C-alpha cells in the first residue's frame, strides 16, 4: 500500500484529529496557574467575580492551542517531524492535516485569543499590561519554533525561541509568571508573592516539551 494511502487508512475521525492536534494533555498548564492566581485573589479579597479570570483562562488556552498548532506546522515544514518521529502523533506529520490547514487553525486560535485579550485590556487599570501580554503572547506562539514564516526559508536556520535555548525562559515567564499573576492583577490590580506558587506548573510544561 502506498505511504499516502496507509496514512489515510489510519486517519482518525476529523473531530479526533482536531482534538489531538491541540495536544489536550498539555492544557492543564494553562488552567492551573490561572486557578492559583484567582484563588489567591479570592483569599485576600473575599468573593470575586470569576468572569475576568475565566476569560483570561480561555485566552491562555487559546494561546497554548495556537502555539501547539503552529509548532506542529513549523516542525513539519522545516523537516523536524519526519516519519521516524517517536512520541505523540503530530497531525501534520501524519498527513491528517495539510500544513495550510494546521497553520490556518493556529491563526484562528490566536486571533480568537487576541480578541479576548483586547476585551480584557479595556478593563480599568489593565490596558497597558494586558495589551503587552496579548501582543507578546501571540508573538511567542509564532516564534517558539518557527515564526510566522518557517525561519529555515528566510536564511535563519533553526534560530527560534524553542531551538535557541530560550524556550524554557519563555515558558517560565508566560506559563509561570504571567498565567499566575494575570488573574490576580485582573482582580486586584496588584501583585502578590504567594501567587508565584503557580510557577510549579512550568515543570509540567518542560516535561511535556
Segments from the language model and where they lie:
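Topogenic membrane-insertion module of multi-pass membrane proteins
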Residues: 1-51, 55, 59, 151-153, ...
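Short hydrophobic alpha-helical membrane-anchoring segments
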Residues: 38, 42, 65-72, 145-146, ...
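Membrane-embedded alpha-helical segments that form the functional core of polytopic membrane enzymes
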Residues: 34-36, 45-71, 132-142, 192-209
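Solvent-exposed interhelical
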Residues: 66-110, 203-209
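Hydrophobic alpha-helical transmembrane segments of integral membrane proteins
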Residues: 18, 26, 30, 53, ...
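Intramembrane alpha-helical segments
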Residues: 90, 94-190
Amino acid at each position: 500500500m502506498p505511504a499516502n494511502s496507509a496514512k489515510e487508512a489510519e486517519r482518525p475521525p476529523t473531530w479526533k484529529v482536531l482534538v489531538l492536534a491541540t495536544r489536550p494533555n498539555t492544557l492543564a498548564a494553562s488552567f492551573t496557574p490561572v486557578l492559583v492566581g484567582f484563588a489567591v485573589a479570592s483569599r485576600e479579597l473575599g468573593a470575586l467575580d470569576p468572569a475576568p479570570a475565566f476569560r483570561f483562562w480561555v485566552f491562555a488556552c487559546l494561546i497554548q492551542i495556537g502555539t501547539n498548532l503552529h509548532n506542529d506546522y513549523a516542525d513539519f515544514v522545516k523537516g523536524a517531524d519526519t516519519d521516524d518521529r517517536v512520541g505523540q502523533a503530530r497531525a501534520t506529520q501524519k498527513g491528517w492535516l495539510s500544513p495550510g490547514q494546521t497553520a490556518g487553525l493556529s491563526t484562528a486560535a490566536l486571533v480568537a485569543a487576541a480578541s479576548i485579550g483586547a476585551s480584557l485590556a479595556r478593563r480599568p487599570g489593565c490596558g497597558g499590561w494586558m495589551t503587552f501580554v496579548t501582543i507578546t503572547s501571540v508573538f511567542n506562539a509564532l516564534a517558539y519554533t518557527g515564526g510566522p514564516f518557517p525561519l529555515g526559508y528566510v536564511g535563519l536556520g533553526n534560530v527560534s525561541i524553542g531551538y535557541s535555548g530560550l524556550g524554557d525562559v519563555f515558558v517560565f515567564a508566560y506559563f509561570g509568571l504571567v498565567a499566575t499573576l494575570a488573574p490576580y492583577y485582573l482582580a486586584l490590580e496588584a501583585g502578590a508573592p504567594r501567587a508565584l506558587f503557580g510557577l510549579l506548573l512550568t515543570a509540567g510544561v518542560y516535561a511535556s516539551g
